[in-house]
A protein has these predicted regions:
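Basic, Gly/Ser/Thr-rich N-terminal segments that form RNA-phosphate-binding interfaces in CRISPR RAMP
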Residues: 1-215
């Protein structure tokens, strides 16, 4: 009988999980996404591969132990044999997404659907905040009796503020806001870390040796 457990991943640097270098065309951002919110997810296979690599590098455990817990790697001699992994890992989805906002400088954004999923997995049975609810330590701009946040694509109005610390895994409240499900995909794409790629022209070594040297 399997035992269920959940974990929380905190990314300390921009994370890209999607197409590899040979599968992209131009600067398309081909990432794995949740089909409802269109926000990024980490496939369970990627998490299992990372955990397998960590275990394989441990001298006290090694390759055999990694294959026992996570199954044989694709392409290995035993990959075609029914060697099912002991540990089953589902995909990881976003709970809070950091978004740049002048004056904050970071606002953590989520939506109702993502919080409902977090509520279901953790079995905390918390009350889902209403859309456009800000955390109690958020510092929105006051203008015409309205509280607003500024993002790159425009302003967002905060209707009310309350303590959201129960929704953060470590229990520490951060500047945050809950938005509608239909708004999170646009904010998500705005907050993505984009990195352009440049490919230099390849020159054979024999031709490179013929190039004139600058004096």
């Amino acid at each position: 009988m399997y035992k269920k457990a959940y974990g929380t991943i905190e990314t300390l640097a921009p994370l890209h999980v999607g197409a590899t270098a040979g599968e992209e065309s131009g600067n398309l951002n081909l990432i794995f996404r949740d089909q409802f919110t269109l926000t990024g997810i980490i496939p369970g296979s990627s998490l299992r591969g990372r955990l397998r690599a960590e275990m394989r590098q441990n001298p006290e455990l090694g390759e055999a132990e990694a294959n026992y817990w996570y199954g044989d790697a694709a392409g290995s001699a035993h990959s075609e044999v029914n060697n099912e992994s002991i540990v089953k890992i589902e995909h990881a989805s976003i709970v809070w997404l950091p978004v740049f906002s002048p004056g904050q400088p970071i606002v953590w954004v989520t939506c109702e659907r993502l919080l409902k999923r977090y509520n279901r997995i953790t079995q905390k049975k918390l009350t889902i905040p209403d859309p456009y609810t800000g955390s109690s330590i958020l510092k929105p701009r006051q203008s015409q009796n309205k509280k607003t946040l500024f993002f790159n694509l425009g302003f967002l109005t905060v209707n009310k503020m309350e303590n959201l610390s129960a929704w953060f895994p470590d229990g520490q409240e951060l500047p945050a806001v809950v938005v509608k499900d239909e708004d999170i995909s646009m904010i998500h794409d705005m907050a993505l870390y984009r990195q352009s790629r440049v490919r230099l022209k390849s020159i054979p070594v024999n031709e490179m040796l013929k190039l004139p040297l600058e004096q």
